[in-house]
């Protein structure tokens, strides 16, 4: 059996070429992934709602075999920082609330928008906020 580092070396950072699913939800089919990513790239990101819509679409695309949640949360913070001078204080969002909001976000994004808006901060250069965000990002992915 290959080690986890050997497995990650084979696909880490590469756009997936297989269709994947989780919890009964099938993410963007592999054959449509590249066009979907091009469309997501073109989406506007001028307002908070537009940025979160883009984030939701990237979650549905799920471009990698592993690490989608962690990488897209960092990606979201980078867009928010660049466009709005804000980021998410992930310590203000519980794992359960976040995961439940993300599960329904592809059909109803209001809940994830409310949740993220409630945790917006202007501490974009605060190292502690950034590092806590990474810690929480891993926590959201852990099995209970």
Question: Could you say what each language-model-derived stretch is?
Answer:
Residues 1-144:
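FIC/Doc superfamily catalytic core
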């Amino acid at each position: 059996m290959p080690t986890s580092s050997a497995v990650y070396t084979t696909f880490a950072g590469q756009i997936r070429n297989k269709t994947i699913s989780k919890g009964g939800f099938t993410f963007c089919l592999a054959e449509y992934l590249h066009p979907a990513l091009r469309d997501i790239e073109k989406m506007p990101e001028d307002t908070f709602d537009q940025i979160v819509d883009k984030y939701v679409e990237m979650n549905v695309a799920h471009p990698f075999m592993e690490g989608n949640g962690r990488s897209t949360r960092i990606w979201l913070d980078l867009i928010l920082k660049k466009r709005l001078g804000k980021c998410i204080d992930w310590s203000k969002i519980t794992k359960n609330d976040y995961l439940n909001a993300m599960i329904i976000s592809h059909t109803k994004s209001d809940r994830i928008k409310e949740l993220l808006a409630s945790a917006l901060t202007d501490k974009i250069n605060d190292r502690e906020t950034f590092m806590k965000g990474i810690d929480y990002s891993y926590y959201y992915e852990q099995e209970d």
